[in-house]
């Protein structure tokens, strides 16, 4: 079984890349949890409006700007995923340093490109 991805910053807006990422992850049979600030669904995935202790998260796919990530630092570190993908525009050296110190892998990449190349 493939491990779960948390899309942090998911949007019900079909024009947003986070929305497309959820759809492509599901198309690739990867379990997805979506977290966002606007209610809705993306394909068959409900957008969670509250944070939970999702123990099964392997990867966080980041779609929050660096300034909006600050309030999630503790949550991300406590969740202790295997990796965090910083999609274009979400790169955050401060959080990357914290991830390094916690031994959490991270990469500046694009979830959609990784999926299209079969490199996810």
What are these regions (language model features)?
Residues 88-115:
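Rossmann-fold NAD(P)-binding glycine/threonine-rich loop
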């Amino acid at each position: 079984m493939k491990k779960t991805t948390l899309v942090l910053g998911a949007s019900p807006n079909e024009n947003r890349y986070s929305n497309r990422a959820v759809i492509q992850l599901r198309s690739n049979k990867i379990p997805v949890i979506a977290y966002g600030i606007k209610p809705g669904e993306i394909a068959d995935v409900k957008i969670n409006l509250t944070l939970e202790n999702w123990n099964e998260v392997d990867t966080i796919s980041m779609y929050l700007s660096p300034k909006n990530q600050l309030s999630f630092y503790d949550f991300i570190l406590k969740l202790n995923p295997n990796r965090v993908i910083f999609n274009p525009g979400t790169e955050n050296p401060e959080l990357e340093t914290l991830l390094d110190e916690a031994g959490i892998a991270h990469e500046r990449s694009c979830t959609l490109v990784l999926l299209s190349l079969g490199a996810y």
